[in-house]
Amino acid sequence: DCLKFVEREKRRGHTYHGILMDPPSYGRGPNGEMWKFEKEVTRLIQACVEILDENSLFFLINSYTTGFSSIVLDNTLRTMILPNHPNGIVETGEIALPIANRDLLLPCGIYGSWQRK
């Protein structure tokens, strides 16, 4: 699973100049471990922040999990990334599809990013 991969990369001393991720809303590991985005995403983001190189350029996450707002993601990114990488900006928002022949949008998910200034 991705959290184990990131933790292994940290132990090996590997760092990254950018991270792009699309974690699932729900999943089960090979030994019955359960992944729920709402409960685990902060651990995953924190682990990823720990392997971001000091000269990193970007961090991007998107999610199609219902019930997890872009405000929560914004707060999470600001409190986890900016203290270690203050030379960047955080942006979050909603992902939506236009509804044909209507002036409406169908909400699909959220995104969040940090990028170097």
Residue ranges and their predicted role:
Residues 1-20:
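S-adenosyl-L-methionine
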Residues 7, 28, 68:
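Conserved protein kinase catalytic core
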Residues 8-11, 47-51, 58, 79:
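Short basic/hydrophobic patches in alpha-helices and adjacent helix-turn junctions
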Residues 16-30:
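Conserved proline-anchored active-site loop of SAM-dependent methyltransferases
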Residues 29-37:
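Glycine/threonine-rich flexible loop motifs
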Residues 36-39, 77-78:
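Glycine-rich, phosphate-binding/catalytic loops in enzymes
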Residues 38-54:
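A short glycine-rich, Lys/Arg-flanked "PGG" loop and its adjoining helix->strand segment in the class I
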Residues 56-117:
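C-terminal catalytic and target-recognition region of SAM-dependent MTase-like enzymes
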